[in-house]
Amino acid sequence: MIGNWNYGTGRRKSAVARVFIKSGKGDIIVNGKPIKEYFARETSLMIVRQPLELTAHAETFDIKVNVTGGGETGQAGAVRHGITRALIDYDATLKPTLSKAGYVTRDAREVERKKVGLHKARRRKQFSKR
């Protein structure tokens, strides 16, 4: 806990989010912008709010987020992971609920590298019989 802020770091793909939460009225600021301005897609907004809605804390915290790297989906997942960790820092009794929903576990899937002689990571050149 930093002052009266609770902290959590979230990661997803190549995105990293540093999340600070404190008691408030439900404002979420991402990189200095309101969340609806920062995340254009409705699915990204839903992903970010999932741990708050699950624990019934959607209107009880002000959240400040610094997120870097990745794209919109990766950043949304990183923010969700960070909010989850910050909620656990605030109240450890929330961990079983969040863990059962799968929000505590870091999604370890990363982009597979492109291999030499292939078009993409696994896509081969088209085979010609003749």
Curated annotation (Swiss-Prot):
Record key words, sorted: Ribonucleoprotein, Ribosomal protein
Coiled coil: none
Database matches in InterPro entries: Ribosomal_Su5_D2-typ_SF, Ribosomal_uS9, Ribosomal_uS9_bac/plastid, Ribosomal_uS9_CS, Ribsml_uS5_D2-typ_fold_subgr
GO MF annotation, one: structural constituent of ribosome
A biological-process GO annotation: translation
Entry GO CC: cytosolic small ribosomal subunit
Gene3D superfamilies, per the entry: 3.30.230.10
Short name of one Pfam family: Ribosomal_S9
PANTHER family in the record: RIBOSOMAL PROTEIN S9 (PTHR21569), SMALL RIBOSOMAL SUBUNIT PROTEIN US9M (PTHR21569:SF1)
UniProt family annotation: Belongs to the universal ribosomal protein uS9 family.
Descriptive protein name: Small ribosomal subunit protein uS9
Gene: rpsI
